[in-house]
């Protein structure tokens, strides 16, 4: 296993990341293993483990510092090789504290090979009072790749009890499909919340809710029938949910689910129900149970 090369995410000459992490997963025998890994600064990964006999490897990302602060830059680069299977999660919530002077930022690059499976299941992102955070995720898939990415965003505690005391949250996902004929844009998902500039609590935005859940699925098996199933599946939860599909590019399609609630636990249950359906139907795996707490 190589441990020398840094991440491939682009940096300008003056930028020094607070933490860097690179991971490449490949198939060895009947299991997926790390063919290369690298870390520097305030990012680590724990030893791999396997939750079932599917061969999917699970890695846990750790930030020993415990939080993101002003002007912090974190860089994560992950490649899942042809036929490999990776579950990537975090040890705990990502906490964004006050960021005076400049925003905290995380840049993520994900690349999936043919037949590769990537499941992203991080703990919630918590933005505290006077926090500004930007997350830019660039994803490249192949037509036979399978991507499932879940995320929950919550406001942190504030002395006055108000929910939206952070300055800015900007979460951008760009998904490209690479085919023999070239690369095409499948989806550009840009979430921007600026509480000081807009009333984000009302109609057309957070609709009176405080927590946001997102699920992004990219797979050749995505179709309208799946979106309809998700609509029915989420109806029994205490949340306001919408599901949409992208156009097909290179034979694969994307699904985006957005859900609003006042509870992290409720959103985790909702997203967990959706991912459990996919895990059983597509991969023959049981519902995800990471048993962190």
Swiss-Prot record:
It is found in: Cytoplasm. Pfam families: UreD. Keywords: Chaperone, Cytoplasm, Nickel insertion. The keyword Cytoplasm applies. The keyword Chaperone applies. It comes from the Bacteria. One of its GO terms (molecular function) is nickel cation binding. One of its GO terms (cellular component) is cytoplasm. Belongs to the UreD family. UreD, UreF and UreG form a complex that acts as a GTP-hydrolysis-dependent molecular chaperone, activating the urease apoprotein by helping to assemble the nickel containing metallocenter of UreC. The UreE protein probably delivers the nickel. Required for maturation of urease via the functional incorporation of the urease nickel metallocenter. PANTHER family: UREASE ACCESSORY PROTEIN D. This is Urease accessory protein UreD. It comes from Arthrobacter sp. (strain FB24). The gene is ureD.
């Amino acid at each position: 296993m190589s441990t020398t090369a840094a991440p491939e995410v682009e940096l300008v000459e003056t930028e020094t990341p607070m933490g860097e992490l690179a991971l490449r997963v490949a198939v060895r025998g009947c299991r997926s293993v790390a063919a290369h890994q690298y870390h520097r600064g305030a990012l680590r990964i724990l030893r791999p483990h396997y939750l079932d006999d599917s061969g999917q490897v699970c890695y846990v990302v750790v930030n020993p510092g415990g939080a993101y602060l002003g002007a912090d830059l974190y860089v994560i680069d992950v490649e899942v090789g042809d036929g490999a299977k990776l579950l990537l999660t975090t040890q705990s919530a990502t906490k964004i504290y006050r960021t005076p002077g400049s925003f905290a930022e995380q840049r993520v690059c994900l690349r999936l090979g043919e037949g590769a499976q990537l499941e992203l299941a991080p703990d919630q992102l918590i933005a505290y009072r006077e926090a500004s955070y930007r997350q830019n995720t660039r994803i490249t898939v192949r037509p036979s790749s399978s991507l499932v990415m879940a995320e929950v965003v919550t406001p942190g505690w504030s002395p006055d009890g108000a929910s939206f005391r952070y300055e800015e949250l900007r979460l951008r996902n760009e998904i490209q499909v690479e085919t023999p004929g070239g690369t095409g844009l499948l989806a550009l998902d840009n979430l921007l919340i600026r509480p000081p500039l807009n009333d984000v609590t009302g109609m057309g935005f957070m609709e009176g809710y405080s927590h946001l859940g997102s699920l992004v699925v990219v797979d050749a098996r995505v179709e309208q029938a799946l979106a309809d199933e998700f609509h029915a599946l989420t109806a029994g939860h205490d949340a306001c949910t919408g599901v949409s599909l992208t156009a097909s590019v290179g034979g694969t399609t994307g699904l985006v689910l957005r859900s609003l609630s006042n509870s992290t636990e409720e959103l985790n249950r909702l997203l967990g129900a959706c991912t459990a359906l996919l895990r059983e139907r597509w991969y023959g795996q049981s519902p995800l149970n990471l048993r962190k707490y």
